[in-house]
Amino acid sequence: MVRKAFKMQLFEGQAKEYEKRHNELWPEMKEMIHEYGGSNYTIFLDEETNVLYGYIELEDEEKWDKTAETEICKKWWAFMADIMETNPDNSPVSVSLKNVFHLD
């Protein structure tokens, strides 16, 4: 199992909308996340800076990387592009975080 953490940037004033969209996460998006080996997916928000911190556990990182090629992922990115920083392909601007400690 691989633990991944990352940060993303939410636009000012979009916290409630971001949370709403994730509370209503499409069933096919949930299925895709599990199909590609993702679990224990959690996103936190720093309300002072609008920085999102994500954490996910993966069965296989190479398999997970293929989620970006799925139509449902591309559709989700387009859906979220108006409320957060994105790359030209609508994927969220995401910065990987270094794991410096873990305790089971």
UniProtKB/Swiss-Prot annotation:
GO biological process entries: rhamnose catabolic process
UniProt-listed Enzyme Commission number(s): 5.1.3.32
Residues given in the record as substrate binding sites: Y18, Y41, W76, W77
One GO CC term on file: cytoplasm
Pathway annotation: Carbohydrate metabolism; L-rhamnose metabolism
Keywords: Carbohydrate metabolism, Cytoplasm, Isomerase, Rhamnose metabolism
Catalysed reactions, semicolon-separated: alpha-L-rhamnose = beta-L-rhamnose
A Pfam family reported for this protein in Swiss-Prot or TrEMBL: rhaM
Main location: cytoplasm
Gene Ontology MF, one: L-rhamnose mutarotase activity
Localization per Swiss-Prot or TrEMBL: Cytoplasm
Superkingdom of origin: Bacteria
EC main group: isomerase
Active site residues per record: H22
Family: Belongs to the rhamnose mutarotase family.
Protein purpose: Involved in the anomeric conversion of L-rhamnose.
Subunit annotation: Homodimer.
PANTHER family, A to Z: L-RHAMNOSE MUTAROTASE
Protein name as catalogued: L-rhamnose mutarotase
Primary gene name: rhaM
